[in-house]
Amino acid sequence: MKLLLSFALLGLVACQEKCDSQNKYCFPNEVATWTGAVEYCLKNGWKLAVVNSEAKQMKIEGLAKNLPEFKNGKVELWIGASDQTKEGHFVWIANGQPIEYANWLPGKPDNKDGKEHCVHLWYEKAKKLNWGWNDVVCTSKRRFVCERKKK
């Protein structure tokens, strides 16, 4: 039991070490499916990020520039939006609210092959993709951004 608790605490500490204490964003050093990312954030007292304003988008972009992947020219991060319940109707998983602010890449969302229902932020220098949103297959694995829940 002590060992299990120690691992749980290590996971929480690792998440917090990557967080901005003022705005409370976290970039766990993990890769997961979209559902796995939702579960990871919830398990640690967070939520998969709700990017419902340009200010939040800019804050997350600024923080993500500190990730090692950014220096390599490519970052993909799950955020908490999906249209799994109703095709074409993207909502925030944390509160069920429809997306009002969005930063879709040109031509997105496109639900390629009828299988893309989860949203990620995508930065890729070589392709000139500058933090736009893209719909992708939910079972693909990538890093993610959690946001501390309001108390």
Curated annotation (Swiss-Prot):
Localization of this protein: Secreted
Induction remark: Blood feeding does not affect expression levels.
Keywords associated with the record: Disulfide bond, Lectin, Secreted, Signal
Tissue expression per record: Expressed in female salivary gland. Not detected or low-level expression in female midgut and fat body.
N-terminal signal peptide: 1-15
Record carries keyword Signal: yes
InterPro entries: C-type_lectin-like (IPR001304), C-type_lectin-like/link_sf (IPR016186), C-type_lectin/snaclec_domain (IPR050111), CTDL_fold (IPR016187)
SMART domains, per the entry: CLECT
Disulfide bond entries: C41-C146, C118-C138
Domain C-type lectin: 25-147
Cofactor requirement: Ca(2+)
GO cellular component: extracellular region
GO function term, MF aspect, one: carbohydrate binding
PANTHER family per UniProt: MANNOSE, PHOSPHOLIPASE, LECTIN RECEPTOR RELATED
Function (record text): Salivary protein with carbohydrate-binding activity. Binds to D-mannose, D-galactose, D-glucose and maltose. Agglutinates host erythrocytes. Probably participates in mosquito innate immune responses to prevent microorganism multiplication in sugar and blood meals. (Microbial infection) Binds to the surface of and agglutinates Escherichia coli in vitro.
Name of this protein: Salivary C-type lectin 2
Organism: Aedes albopictus
Lineage of source species: Eukaryota, Metazoa, Ecdysozoa, Arthropoda, Hexapoda
